[in-house]
Amino acid sequence: HCISSAASDVYKRQHAVGDEKWYEKISVRYTGRVKNSIKTKDNLLFKKNLIRDWENGMQHEIPVSATFTLFKYFNVTPTVNYTERWYTRKVKKDWDDEQGKEVNDTTYGFHRVYDYSASLGINTKVYGMYKPLFMKKKEIQIRHVITPSISFSAAPDFTSSRFGYYDSYIKDQNGIRDTVQYSYYAGQVFSPPSGGKQGLISFNISNNLEMKFKDKNDSIRKVSLIDDLSMGISYNTAAQVRPWSDLSFNLRLKLSKSYTLSMSSTFATYAYEFDENGRVVPGNRTEWSYGRFGRWSGYGTSFSWTVNNDSWKKIRNFFTG
């Protein structure tokens, strides 16, 4: 079951007078989800205990965001996300040396688990207009739009003991001792908060290229040359090793009103090295430190076709004559 409530612009005045206030730009949304399921035989369905036998829970998501203009040219978007989960069971795990296996101790009741994160995005647009070197006599103009952006996002480490969502035990098997970390709420209808402190700085720059010209009837036409050409990379300030992400490139071409070609490519930031066992593994030195751009590690392409009313008419006429 899903309960969704969109409460955008909750602070806007119904009868505004004068300029818009800063707090009127704040948007608040709420989404609630309830899950309740069980796997059993038909004749045993109503004999099961709602708390012990059913898989159930509830999740609340509340994003709060706003968009402001800074110095007339910069768009600033702060966002705070809050998620809360309600569980009906808590599972504590341990290692039983005699049985040589993991054992569970389940506590039933109401268990509230939450997590939160915050982010801040800043972007602007730079416009350029120029005439191509070829066909100078024709009225052709190229518009280039560059959109640089930077964003900051942060979240605490929810595996920390101060939150009480995670625990660990010592696994002693075949003379090998390992520390196993786990969440009390893993495997339930809603996933628990993920681990690891986050402090991400993301950089992105996108380009759009459009040509404007006059046709034979002196009508102005616009043609998309490059719908989007972008590159992005991020830096995790909380990472102890290898804080840089891979460098990604994306290209989208609108071949017509209905056809779109998309391509993407990824370049690994860190160079390979040999570990103590002679295996090739990603190292801690960047490709840049060796004077290389990056290590190509993947490529993808997709082709999409958008069907509109005109397209449906053409298809129908093709089959019906």
Regions found by a protein language model. Give the residues of each.
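Outer-membrane beta-barrel proteins and related beta-barrel translocases across Gram-negative bacteria
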Residues: S5-G321
